[in-house]
Swiss-Prot record:
Protein activity control: The omega-1 hydroxylase activity is stimulated by cytochrome b5.
Binding site for heme: 437
SUPFAM superfamilies: Cytochrome P450
Organism the protein comes from: Rattus norvegicus (Rat)
Taxonomic path: Eukaryota, Metazoa, Chordata, Craniata, Vertebrata
Name of this chain's protein: Cytochrome P450 2E1
Amino acid sequence: MAVLGITIALLVWVATLLVISIWKQIYNSWNLPPGPFPLPILGNIFQLDLKDIPKSFTKLAKRFGPVFTLHLGSRRIVVLHGYKAVKEVLLNHKNEFSGRGDIPVFQEYKNKGIIFNNGPTWKDVRRFSLSILRDWGMGKQGNEARIQREAQFLVEELKKTKGQPFDPTFLIGCAPCNVIADILFNKRFDYNDKKCLRLMSLFNENFYLLSTPWIQLYNNFADYLRYLPGSHRKIMKNVSEIKQYTLEKAKEHLQSLDINCARDVTDCLLIEMEKEKHSQEPMYTMENVSVTLADLFFAGTETTSTTLRYGLLILMKYPEIEEKLHEEIDRVIGPSRVPAVRDRLDMPYMDAVVHEIQRFINLVPSNLPHEATRDTVFQGYVIPKGTVVIPTLDSLLYDSHEFPDPEKFKPEHFLNENGKFKYSDYFKAFSAGKRVCVGEGLARMELFLLLSAILQHFNLKSLVDPKDIDLSPVTVGFGSIPPQFKLCVIPRS
């Protein structure tokens, strides 16, 4: 009888929880955008393909329209699909939706740094970081010289492969890693430096793990899954190791800091910290400095590295495009002069290819989640404060009206009828508004200069027939992860 009583009590308890959950879901749905009816606790998880959530969003948008609501666990999510909705949220309502949506795997850093910070320090830290990055040449001539210098190191390393097959992941990745390391720490690594290779391995592994089905599940049901084994623990461990490195670099800088003569971004942040050392609520603590540096280091290395690597794979599949690029490089730059930013005006095809690579690979398809900072009326719906908002970037990059045959790689998407470069307002690979990527100018410059330098000196050779190269990402979640591959680079005669 005792066992039966306990069983009945448990059933009543579970039933009560289910009823409360259903009631909450229905109650909280008033005035929200439409969407599929959520199951208790689980929400709409079965409406999503965890191996390709952006594709699921596209299917749901066809059914419910460009603005729709999902419930995942206790999270209420509004998804925006298409140019009009995404642009309106990111630009016309940029203050109302400037919060950072909760990402549980990075919960420890929710109120620190730039990328995942959703606390009171975010605006000031971001504003100051942008200011010092500009001072250190972000998107300006200072960075052009840095990238040109690193491009020559990269070319020399590629020559050492002597035409033999190699995995480009870390060799190519060293170039953007060194550019951002010079800006942040006044330091560059040798291409075989163990610490550099270790850091890039951590960046690469985290970018991959963030895109796996388990992490998509974890970020929506963290309350139930956080104590289980899984790759979320590996990500947290990797982030801790990266942050430990930036913390050590900050401490090293502090020992020789001259507040009147900053050597790099780290010094600039530490000088602000020194100014606040008597404040009761300092913004620039050593913890916040180290997380900010880790954010910039990861973002400045991995995204550009992955884009370049994916770009090389694409060019091997389409050798006729590579040939056109060689012709343009030979005509504008020649065989020996170092590529420069000014060349972009005379190289519309290279400019178009760089943009098309970014559009086609769709590196961060669903953007990082935003959050409503206040109750907001949007297109006739009420989006309550705290709602996670996802402006899907892939819905712009793969818009079939703006980019005919969006599933195909076509540099012509960014060329007019006269062969001149044609910019598209749908090109939002770096997002837009208050949360736009702080390194957009640097990344654009790196992609153009590094790819130009590689193709100036080398022909790309695939180990398989170009027709057999599969460009499909191995997984799509936080990012679109390219397949692993090897290639040969053959010096051009």
